[in-house]
């Protein structure tokens, strides 16, 4: 049987853009997108994507060309996730919270042929173009504005805009047929830049195959039912969720875009609301608060380099018999690999041996599978480091519990080494989140003359717990209260020796806390016990 060859009939490259074609054929009356008063069916979305792809091809967009987009959650950015790869190109969604300098850095590196930008960001576009014009190497960039659908505002006849491209597109039958026939499933489908909380962002290249299999893995792992309604409250620019909104088309679901200015009313829901959350590890105390609001929480772990969600907390029926607090502790774990993850492990960096499954011994989380990126664009050194020893080295520190579930403990750069002992900043944060005064917390290492490093907690208090007229004595008393609370719930060497109160924590465009900024602040701080030693 080894000599049986693959052929065109039995070897069709995998790509998630086929989800769209199938949805339009199978569910002609099913809603695909709800955006304010705008409604589209799957055939309408399919037609718009085909027209947009045809227009891109007419603009000489070809295989592996990069198309960048800066836009909020709108039907346009959803359509581009299908239409751009249908034209053979690579979509590069850019975070709208980045400033002009950061976006210009990405554009210089990605070298896109087209930049789509929402009309709301027109001043930002002018600043970006000014910065690009100062370069020695000119980027020949076509800028196309996106206006709201059915907007009365239209650009001049000399400018191209998004809706005009769709109207002008002529998707002939042969052209459409070729749109869904990619040459190689390992061809790139998207270029996403990491959030860059610890360094300059890197361009992560994802394949059609990786996006396809991860989409199916997410749908199966989340137990997404048929005809789901998916409410988008996170930016479409994040690869972490690309798999869900592309895969949702295969489940004949539809997308709802949530506008943050409007309160989220859950009073009219007809069934349970399932909430998927990822990013930084979610404290059990926060899971408990969210579930009491009526959500069913699914905790996931993912990263851009793994095409988004990679581990799910796989709920076991016997856990339903546990107390609420015990259940929340289990839900706070990140869990097991999804379908597209072949293997996941936690290993010692020095020996590359697996850590014991005791829920205590920490190591680096590593994984391999069809979900893993192709590599970093134009950065072979970083790609080599990421794939050392035949695994994707995530840079995240975790443990494996006796039941095989993985729990993240920290980023490797956020581990605090005090007197030779490794301290998980996340573990300390989880304890502080249980204190009724604490709204938000981040724990980082601060220098210590005796122990080398010691934990320092930066805390935002709950509303009503502080005001500008509070005197220093009140803050000192609160600091002592929180340190004593940690000493009651943690080994003393893990407890913060300094607490700093802030009105808000510094965050990047994705909402991740910028711990390097906080570590910089600690260089000017002195722990109380250290002050006694110095004196």
UniProtKB/Swiss-Prot annotation:
<dbReference type="Pfam" id="PF00501">
    <property type="entry name" value="AMP-binding"/>
</dbReference>
<comment type="function">
    <text>May act as an acid--thiol ligase that activates carboxylic acids by forming acyl-CoAs.</text>
</comment>
<comment type="similarity">
    <text>Belongs to the ATP-dependent AMP-binding enzyme family.</text>
</comment>
<dbReference type="GO" id="GO:0006631">
    <property type="term" value="P:fatty acid metabolic process"/>
</dbReference>
<dbReference type="InterPro" id="IPR000873">
    <property type="entry name" value="AMP-dep_synth/lig_dom"/>
</dbReference>
<keyword id="KW-0436">Ligase</keyword>
<protein>
    <recommendedName>
        <fullName>Probable acyl-activating enzyme 22</fullName>
        <ecNumber>6.2.1.-</ecNumber>
    </recommendedName>
</protein>
<dbReference type="GO" id="GO:0016874">
    <property type="term" value="F:ligase activity"/>
</dbReference>
<keyword id="KW-0443">Lipid metabolism</keyword>
<keyword id="KW-0276">Fatty acid metabolism</keyword>
<dbReference type="InterPro" id="IPR025110">
    <property type="entry name" value="AMP-bd_C"/>
</dbReference>
<dbReference type="Pfam" id="PF13193">
    <property type="entry name" value="AMP-binding_C"/>
</dbReference>
<dbReference type="InterPro" id="IPR042099">
    <property type="entry name" value="ANL_N_sf"/>
</dbReference>
<dbReference type="InterPro" id="IPR045851">
    <property type="entry name" value="AMP-bd_C_sf"/>
</dbReference>
């Amino acid at each position: 049987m080894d000599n049986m060859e693959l052929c065109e009939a039995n070897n069709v490259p995998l790509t998630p853009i086929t989800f769209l074609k199938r949805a339009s054929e199978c569910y002609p009356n099913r809603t695909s997108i709800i955006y304010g008063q705008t409604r589209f069916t799957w055939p309408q979305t399919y037609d718009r994507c085909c027209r947009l792809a045809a227009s891109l091809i007419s603009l000489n967009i070809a295989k592996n060309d990069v198309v960048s987009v800066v836009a909020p959650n709108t039907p346009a950015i959803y359509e581009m996730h299908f239409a751009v790869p249908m034209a053979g190109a690579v979509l590069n969604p850019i975070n709208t919270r980045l400033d002009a300098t950061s976006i210009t850095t990405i554009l210089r590196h990605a070298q896109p042929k087209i930049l789509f930008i929402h009309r709301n960001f027109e001043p930002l576009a002018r600043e970006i173009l000014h910065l690009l014009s100062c370069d020695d190497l000119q980027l020949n960039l076509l800028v196309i504005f996106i206006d709201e659908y059915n907007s009365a505002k239209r650009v001049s006849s000399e400018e191209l805009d998004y809706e005009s491209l769709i109207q002008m597109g002529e998707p002939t039958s042969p052209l459409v047929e070729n749109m869904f026939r990619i040459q190689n499933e390992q061809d790139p489908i998207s270029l996403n830049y990491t959030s860059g909380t610890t360094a300059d962002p890197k361009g992560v290249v994802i394949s059609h195959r990786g996006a396809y299999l991860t989409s199916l893995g997410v749908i199966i792992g989340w137990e997404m039912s048929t005809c789901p309604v998916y409410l988008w409250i996170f930016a479409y620019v994040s690869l972490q969720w690309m798999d869900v909104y592309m895969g949702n088309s295969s489940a004949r679901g539809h997308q709802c875009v949530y506008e943050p200015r409007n309160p989220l009313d859950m009073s009219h829901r007809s069934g349970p609301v399932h909430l998927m959350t990822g990013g930084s590890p979610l404290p059990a105390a926060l899971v408990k608060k969210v579930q009491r609001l009526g959500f069913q929480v699914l905790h996931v772990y993912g990263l851009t380099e793994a095409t988004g969600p990679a581990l799910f907390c796989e709920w076991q029926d016997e856990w339903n018999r546990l107390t609420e607090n015990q259940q929340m502790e289990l839900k706070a774990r990140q869990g097991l690999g999804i379908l597209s993850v072949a293997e996941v492990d936690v290993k010692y960096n020095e020996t590359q041996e697996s850590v014991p499954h005791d829920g205590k011994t920490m190591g680096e989380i590593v994984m391999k599978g069809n979900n893993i990126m192709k590599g970093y664009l134009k950065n072979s050194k970083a790609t080599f480091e990421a794939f050392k020893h035949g695994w994707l080295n995530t840079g995240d520190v975790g443990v494996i519990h006796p039941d095989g579930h993985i729990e993240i403990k920290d980023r490797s750069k956020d581990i605090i080494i005090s007197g030779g002992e490794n301290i998980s900043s996340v573990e300390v944060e989880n304890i502080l989140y249980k204190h009724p005064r604490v709204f938000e917390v981040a724990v980082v290492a601060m220098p210590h003359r005796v122990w080398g490093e010691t934990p320092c907690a930066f805390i935002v208090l709950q509303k009503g717990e502080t005001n500008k007229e509070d005197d220093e004595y009140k803050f000192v008393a609160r600091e002592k209260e929180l340190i004593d609370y940690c000493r009651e719930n943690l080994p003393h060497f893990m407890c913060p020796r300094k607490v700093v109160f802030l009105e808000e924590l510094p965050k990047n465009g994705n909402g991740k806390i910028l711990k390097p900024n906080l570590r910089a602040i600690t260089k000017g701080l002195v722990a109380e016990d250290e002050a006694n030693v110095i004196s």
